[in-house]
Each structure stands twice: as structure tokens, then as C-alpha cells.
Curated annotation (Swiss-Prot):
Record membrane topology: Peripheral membrane protein
Molecular function, one GO term: peptidoglycan lytic transglycosylase activity
Underlying gene: mltF
EC number assigned by the record: 4.2.2.n1
PANTHER family linked: MEMBRANE-BOUND LYTIC MUREIN TRANSGLYCOSYLASE F
Region ranges (Non-LT domain): 19-266
TM region positions: none
Protein name: Membrane-bound lytic murein transglycosylase F
Naturally occurring in which organism (per UniProt): Histophilus somni (strain 2336) (Haemophilus somnus)
Record GO biological process: cell wall macromolecule catabolic process; cell wall organization; peptidoglycan catabolic process
Length: 479
């Protein structure tokens, strides 16, 4: 429902934005050589962003994140290369944009009246609100008026102006600013180091997956639309191209697919499940991570690990009443097909599970988009290839696109309804379980990726601090 609302807002914003910009754009010839002379000459689009688990980060398979995927698609649309230019804050992004160091600022940036007067605004492509957070188990505040502890927000944040306006209604409201990032402040709330912080609803949802102690008190604001920002000087052609691109991204489902990939699974946050899972990541996964890495094949090893957690909670001796066993919960028939002799041996189980999933991937029709193929294959892994073929046929009969995971997955529960399954080749299936199976794996995979990203960030910070100490000692000795 929220995704539909966002897409409706998106379409309205695009229409209003286009109407508002008709006059200056009447003079723009919309051919690719006129999109942006500088970008075309250098054959590169430079996009400024902020390094965080929502917008952009470098994973084991390279660059990823919502803003990266959308920027990459726009660069492809312009037929140029892409360079992501990560900075530490929104202020730094706008400074770089004003100085011409970047072509676009893209970091889940809310609409702000003052900035829209200084920079050109791209179409809205998402929406989020500001939320007050506190540590789970502590007293939940009801309004900004009755905060009993310290509220800390990032320095140079758009929040400062919002809170100044709120202070007129709540004169007792006070807050402090910090040079820490929004993510770091959320972690401090989770660890009880500060009482409250305010973050976007998207940032809160993402970080709850790795710090489940983060709790939401209330929305500080209504939803704001999210935009890209462009330079106010000489960027009309780029702005025109961006409007065309966003229109096509809505029509061909790109925006919906990216939104589903990064946000849909976040709605399933469960405190107890997340705590148990994170504990397993810390204590159990290190033992088996080398095996997931060894047998990942063309997959991301985090995905393979997430599948195994969904199947067995990384218990090599797991056995179900139906006879499936081991880390990847293989049937006897699958084990025989993959030529393994002991399903309870972790290495054999992981190897066979990976090979079987690769086999299913090869059986997916070529018409399915590359980024969606794995989700179709996982549904088949869970309920069988025959039932997947059934739900694809059913989706087509209902007027949907059988190659679009967004459209197919919503029909999975129909496989358990008599009015539908009696007309299907392979009959009844617990499609609702396959739906939840895929959603859980996506959530688990993102949690593993974020956990290891944070571990790497801490290691990098530790090494940098040590290098600074060594450098200082060397300089003192030379004196």
C-alpha cells in the first residue's frame, strides 16, 4: 500500500513539475547530443552521494545502494559512464554541487524550499518522514514536549530548521548537534549512549535490521518527497533528460523494482527474530562463512548464507518432519541428484544447495530480468519449479506480467486458494510460504551485508587511527 502511495505521489509530482517547467523547456531540443554538453564531452556522469546502507556503499560485489542503481540507470540512459562521488554530509554535497564538482546530488534528499531556490530540482522518486527514536525498553516519549533525556542530531542537518520551527510550539525543546553521522547516532541510541535522535523513516527501518534496540517513538513530520538536485547554472538540458528518464523509469517499472528491492522487506521487522539472527551472525556464521564463500559460484555469498539461515538457522543437523535435512534442508531426491552422500555434512550440504540453486537459475526463462531471476529461482527452490510455472501462467491469465517479480509474487498466495489451484497444472501449493520465504531471505541477506560492512568500517577506522598514531610518533622522533 505504501509503495502504491509513493508511486501515485511520484506521478503527481512529475506531472506538476513538467507543467511548471514547460516554458523554459520549449526551447530545448531533446536530442542526446544536447542533454548536457560537459557530461557528453567527458563521457561521464558524476553523482555526489552519502556513504550509508540506503544510498550507496561498496559491498563484496562492488558498488550498490538505491542511489547507485538509479544513477547507473540514468548514466546508461545518457550513454555515458558513471562515477559515484561519496561525501560525508548533505551540506558537503550541496557545496560540491555549487562548485561544479558533481553533476547531481543524490542521497535520499528531502525537498527543501531554500535549496530549491538555489538549485534545480529533479522529480520526486520516493517519500519518507522524520522519526524520533529511543532505546527499546526505555520510557517512550509521546511528544517533543516531554523528552526526559538528551536529543542529539547530526550537525549541519536540515533537522535543525525543522526543530527551530517546532520550538515555537514546544518552548522547552532543546537539542545538541554532533559531528557523528545519522547512522552512528542511531547506533548510540541503540547502545544507550544517548537518549534520542531523529532520523528518516527509511534510515530507521534499515538500521533496525542490525540494531533492533532502535525503537520509534513517533513521526516528527509528515512525509516529504525525495529528490535529486542539480546545479542552477547550465543544467536545463540535464534536467530535461532527467524528467524523460524518470517518466520512463516509472512506466517500465524500474522505480518500483528498486523500491521493492531496498524497502519492501523492511516492513517485516521483528525484534525477537532480529535479535536472534544478529546473535547467530556474530557467533555461528563465522564458522561457516568460508564454505559459503567457497561454493557461492555466481551468487553473492551473503545470499547463500541467508538461504541457509532461512532453511536451518545454520544448524547442520536440522531435520524436518518431512525428511529434509542439513544446513540447506535438502530432500533425499535433491541430494541424490547433486551426488552428495551425507546431507548432515555442512560442506556437502552447502555445495549441493548452491549447485541446485544455480541449476534452477539456468531454468528460468530468458525473458525474466537479470535482477529478478534469483527471486524466481528461490521461489522454485522453496515450492518446486512446477508451482513456479503455475504462478507465472496464473499471473498472465490475470493480466499481469509473468516476467515481473513484483507482479508474480503477489499472486503466490493464490496457489493455496481452491478457485485458482483447481485449474492449475500442478495444483495446490503453499504459495504464501514461498512469498514469505523469499522476503525473509532478502531481509536476512541485507542484515548480513550491513553487519560485515560495519565490521569493515570499524576495521578501517582502527587502522587509520593507528596510522595517525605511528605518524605522530615518527614526527616526534625526528624532532
Amino acid at each position: 500500500m505504501k509503495g502504491l502511495f509513493i508511486r501515485i505521489v511520484l506521478a503527481i509530482c512529475l506531472s506538476l513539475w513538467a507543467i511548471d517547467m514547460v516554458f523554459p523547456w520549449q526551447q530545448i531540443v531533446r536530442s542526446k547530443q544536447n542533454y548536457h554538453t560537459t557530461i557528453q564531452e567527458r563521457q561521464k556522469l558524476i553523482v555526489g552521494t552519502i556513504n550509508n546502507p540506503v544510498s550507496y556503499f561498496i559491498g563484496t560485489n562492488g558498488e550498490t545502494g538505491l542511489e547507485y542503481e538509479l544513477s547507473k540507470a540514468f548514466a546508461n540512459y545518457l550513454n555515458v559512464d558513471l562515477e559515484m562521488f561519496p561525501l560525508n554530509s548533505a551540506d558537503a554535497l550541496f557545496q560540491a554541487l555549487a562548485q561544479g564538482k558533481i553533476d547531481i546530488a543524490a542521497a535520499s534528499l528531502f525537498y527543501q524550499q531554500d535549496r530549491s531556490e538555489k538549485f534545480k530540482l529533479g522529480p520526486a522518486y520516493h517519500a519518507a518522514s522524520w522519526q524520533l527514536t529511543y532505546r527499546k525498553g526505555e520510557r517512550r516519549p509521546i511528544t517533543l514536549e516531554n523528552l526526559s533525556g538528551k536529543l542529539v542530531i547530526p550537525a549541519n542537518s536540515a533537522l535543525n530548521n525543522i526543530l527551530l520551527a517546532k520550538k515555537e510550539k514546544y518552548p522547552s525543546l532543546t537539542w545538541e548537534t554532533s559531528e557523528l553521522s545519522q547512522e552512528e547516532l542511531l547506533f548510540q541510541v541503540a547502545e544507550g549512549k544517548i537518549d534520542y535522535t531523529i532520523a528518516t523513516s527509511t534510515e530507521v527501518s534499515v538500521n533496525q535490521q542490525i540494531k533492533p534496540q532502535i525503537a520509534i517513538a513517533f513521526n516528527v513530520t509528515d512525509e516529504f518527497t525525495v529528490h535529486w538536485y542539480l546545479s542552477d547554472k547550465g543544467a536545463s538540458e540535464l534536467q530535461a533528460a532527467l524528467l524523460d528518464f524518470m517518466n520512463s523509469a516509472i512506466e517500465n517499472g524500474l522505480i518500483a523494482r528498486i523500491e521493492e528491492k531496498y524497502f519492501n522487506h523492511l516492513n517485516q521487522f521483528d525484534y525477537v527474530d532480529t535479535r536472534s539472527y544478529l546473535n547467530a551472525i556474530e557467533t555461528v556464521l563465522p564458522k561457516y562463512a568460508p564454505l559459503f564463500e567457497k561454493y557461492k559460484g555466481d551468487l553473492d555469498w551473503h545470499l547463500l548464507a541467508a538461504i541457509s539461515y532461512q532453511e536451518s538457522h545454520w544448524n547442520p543437523e536440522a531435520t524436518s518432519p518431512t525428511g529434509v535435512r542439513g544446513m540447506m534442508m535438502l530432500t533425499k531426491a535433491t541430494a541424490d541428484r547433486m551426488n552428495i552422500t551425507n546431507r548432515l555434512d555442512p560442506e556437502q550440504s552447502i555445495k549441493a544447495g548452491s549447485e541446485y540453486l544455480h541449476l534452477l537459475l539456468k531454468q528460468m526463462p530468458d525473458t525474466i530480468l537479470k535482477e529478478d531471476r534469483i527471486w524466481f529461482a528461490l521461489a522454485a527452490y522453496n515450492m518446486g519449479l512446477g508451482h513456479l510455472l503455475d504462478v507465472r501462467r496464473l499471473t498472465k491469465q490475470l493480466g499481469g506480467n509473468p516476467d515481473n517479480w513484483l507482479e508474480v509474487k503477489k499472486n503466490l498466495p493464490l496457489l493455496a486458494q481452491k478457485r485458482y489451484f483447481t485449474h492449475l497444472k500442478y495444483g495446490y501449493a503453499r504459495g504464501y510460504e514461498a512469498f514469505q520465504y523469499v522476503e525473509n531471505i532478502r531481509r536476512y541477506m541485507n542484515s548480513i551485508m550491513n553487519y560485515y560492512r560495519l565490521q569493515q568500517n570499524q576495521q578501517d577506522r582502527y587502522e587509520n587511527e593507528n596510522n595517525d598514531v605511528i605518524s605522530t610518533q615518527t614526527q616526534q622522533e625526528q624532532r
